[in-house]
A protein has these predicted regions:
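NUDIX/MutT-family hydrolases
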Residues: 88, 97-128
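Conserved N-terminal beta-strand and adjoining loop/helix that marks the start
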Residues: 1-21
Length: 133
């Protein structure tokens, strides 16, 4: 099975308090309309943190700071295996402008279940919820 390595930014309002996190709804493909943490593929020779900064700049026109790693998701979709490193991130500059996603919102820990998450992203939600205030 083909393996795809990606990174995801769990962008929070404050690295100390983590009251709200930013999620985007996919704007294309089989999972269009489902929610995910923004990010993307790691290019050859690129560190995960570098890939994350590049992807968020491309997708959201925003500069981020990458903080602690939350964990790695290993998930089998029907046609590929996904390995996704998830990191806490904060906005350094920019306005989180949607370039690829169809929608976005800030969610509190009580609102995490209010959107339909992509299957892989669902697997780390509980860990994120426990770390939010």
């Amino acid at each position: 099975m083909k393996m795809i390595r990606v990174v995801a930014a769990v962008i929070c309002d404050s690295i100390q308090t983590k009251h709200r996190i930013y999620a985007t709804a996919r704007g294309y493909g089989d999972y269009k309309g489902q929610w995910e943490f923004p990010g993307g593929k790691i290019e050859p020779g690129e560190a995960p943190q570098q890939a994350l900064k590049r992807e968020i700049e491309e997708e959201l026109d925003t500069e981020i700071a990458v903080h602690d790693k939350i964990g790695t998701i290993e998930y089998d979709y029907p046609t590929f295996h996904l390995s996704m490193d998830c990191f806490w991130c904060t906005v350094v500059s920019g306005e989180l402008i949607l370039k690829e996603a169809e929608a976005a919102c800030w969610l509190t820990k009580d609102e995490l279940d209010s959107v339909q998450w992509l299957p892989a992203d669902q697997t780390i939600l509980e860990k994120i919820r426990e770390m939010m205030k």
